[in-house]
């Protein structure tokens, strides 16, 4: 049976944990050695020493490919966590030294990334000009996955985050967004009833987008089958839909953050649908298990407290709280 060492006598080194991970990734001692720029005998010796110290066999060497034993899988699992903490320690020290300098990686779903984030980033940059900001705009699911994988600091999305990803994240309601039906300025349609929607020529995003799914759910609740809508055109971006509507190709449900100013300036005509209101929540999300740099912490605090850098909410967006 393995005898636990004293607290200050760990039975492994970080180099040994790096070697275990490399062998698991590469499937052989030689390739692991190549990836670490050391000799194969040095890798073998470190593994032998680690197995002797732990009193277990970590790798099955009988096949063509080296495989982890059950004990090896346990060691790999905790090795990943230990090495992750080491990386975060380095990040935290660098962040402490840099103070006002840093890098912030944000994620957003399409509507949020196009119409909400530019205003937020501009205000943040005015307060912290030395912090560089990177914005990734993808679907809600992809953004949530990147948060879980530790590739993003903070994200704001409009769609529902899948439960299997949400349980790894801290998710908070940030704002409410409304969708309105719009047509070209000269559109002859006036205040259509719900049943009239079936006869209108629609321009939409693809069915997999969170925007389309939100609209479809609300229409279903009001007795309108989205599959029966006359979808004249499916496009991949909100701006493309706006251009198509302005060209008179049809009508579209669009977020007020995307068209509110355009409606006010007469570039679109808002068509009030009797008895229909489509609202959705915008979600602020981050990974609580990931080290948050000072740049990310300041961004989060500004959004949550409405202080520091956030002076003016994005136009046509109602912040919650």
How would you name each of these model-derived features?
Residues 21-39:
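Short helix-boundary/capping micro-motifs
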Residues 1-11, 221, 256-265, 275-321:
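C-terminal effector-binding regulatory domain of bacterial HTH transcription factors
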Residues 26, 35, 49-57, 127:
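Residue cluster at the C-terminal edge of the helix-turn-helix DNA-binding motif
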Residues 101-164, 318-319:
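Central regulatory/effector-binding core of bacterial HTH transcription factors
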Residues 51-73:
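A short LG(V/I)-centered, amphipathic sequence patch enriched
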Residues 53-54, 75-97, 299, 310-316:
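Alpha-helical linker/hinge and terminal dimerization helices associated
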